[in-house]
Swiss-Prot record:
This is Beta-1,4-glucuronyltransferase 1. The gene is B4GAT1. Its cofactor is Mn(2+). The chain crosses the membrane at residues 9-36. Its main location: Golgi. Glycans are attached at N204, N300. It comes from Pongo abelii (Sumatran orangutan). Pathway: Protein modification; protein glycosylation. Beta-1,4-glucuronyltransferase involved in O-mannosylation of alpha-dystroglycan (DAG1). Transfers a glucuronic acid (GlcA) residue onto a xylose (Xyl) acceptor to produce the glucuronyl-beta-1,4-xylose-beta disaccharide primer, which is further elongated by LARGE1, during synthesis of phosphorylated O-mannosyl glycan. Phosphorylated O-mannosyl glycan is a carbohydrate structure present in alpha-dystroglycan (DAG1), which is required for binding laminin G-like domain-containing extracellular proteins with high affinity. It is a single-pass type II membrane protein. Keywords: Glycoprotein, Glycosyltransferase, Golgi apparatus, Manganese, Membrane, Metal-binding, Signal-anchor, Transferase, Transmembrane, Transmembrane helix. Pfam families: Glyco_transf_49. One of its GO terms (biological process) is axon guidance.
Amino acid sequence: MQMSYAIRCAFYQLLLAALMLVAMLQLLYLSLLSGLHGQEEQDQYFEFFPPSPRSVDQVKTQLRTALASGGVLDASGDYRVYRGLLKTTMDPNDVILATHASVDNLLHLSGLLERWEGPLSVSVFAATKEEAQLATVLAYALSSHCPDMRARVAMHLVCPSRYEAAVPDPREPGEFALLRSCQEVFDKLARVAQPGINYALGTNVSYPNNLLRNLAREGANYALVIDVDMVPSEGLWRGLREMLDQSNQWGGTALVVPAFEIRRARRMPMNKNELVQLYQVGEVRPFYYGLCTPCQAPTNYSRWVNLPEESLLRPAYVVPWQDPWEPFYVAGGKVPTFDERFRQYGFNRISQACELHVAGFDFEVLNEGFLVHKGFKEALKFHPQKEAENQHNKILYRQFKQELKAKYPNSPRRC
């Protein structure tokens, strides 16, 4: 009887000790949870995203630093610029693919990352405060889940000067909180994007294309500046790097990459052979063929498609610049910047091509590489204000050409 009583006492003591241990563990758990929650409140950062592979802490730090700066105003005072929302290590002597996009059009980065194997720099324009916030969330989500974004992409943000971008509140995770992979981020972006008519922002803010171009190519000795909805041919970056490694003599020469456009239903051609087959049946045509044939005609597409096939990328023939040619090109040396007074539609690229010509650059067309725009450019796909903007920029272009005479008084070339 006494032994039974002793056993029962020992059992109750053991049970009491176990209950006390459980209680202590629960208190410890609640304390840690409270501390973590307080850290979230303090940090005001992207803790609603799941843990990701290496460099995520660096991404968060860089985003925080870029946004905390408050940005800087552009020369006009109309736009606020946040440099280095995302940063990557870029060799200044590498060939950079520089592009620009509205927030909706960031979905095209997926195709660029697949085709362009080198460094890429993108300037993003957010027309509203909500878009600016979405851009910061996207920057983190893409770099968090896409290793190529972390390794190869620099991202900058531009918004109207009256807005300031800020780090999103972790209590409001939004559309991208539960995504787990790079493909999921791009799929989600494609679903929430609102494809619209070219340059129709739905606000009274002008799209600052030349400011965005300059920002994207800033600091690069060699850059191919393209629109985000264009895709380069496979291996173009490797071919350009090999050319650069062999010659290192690009100063004063603009290497023209022929540009085409394709019906949207078609798969993007990877090489010149595939492109030429589509070109011959009318599924691919010169860029801007339906809007401004002379704008690309000097490229001499008939000559280019009939060049003999070669394994190495090289300049094939020289083309004297003539108005209104606005080629896409890679150049080294002191390339003139894009004039940031040109906004919205009209004369924003030709003005820079014109200055290249006056500054003494020569144009040589590459034999194998090319660019393809997704879809045929058609007049009906532009916003109603296109013609008014074009006329405004046409007057500005005339003024710009007069200014070039004063800027290059010893140049025999004119536009």
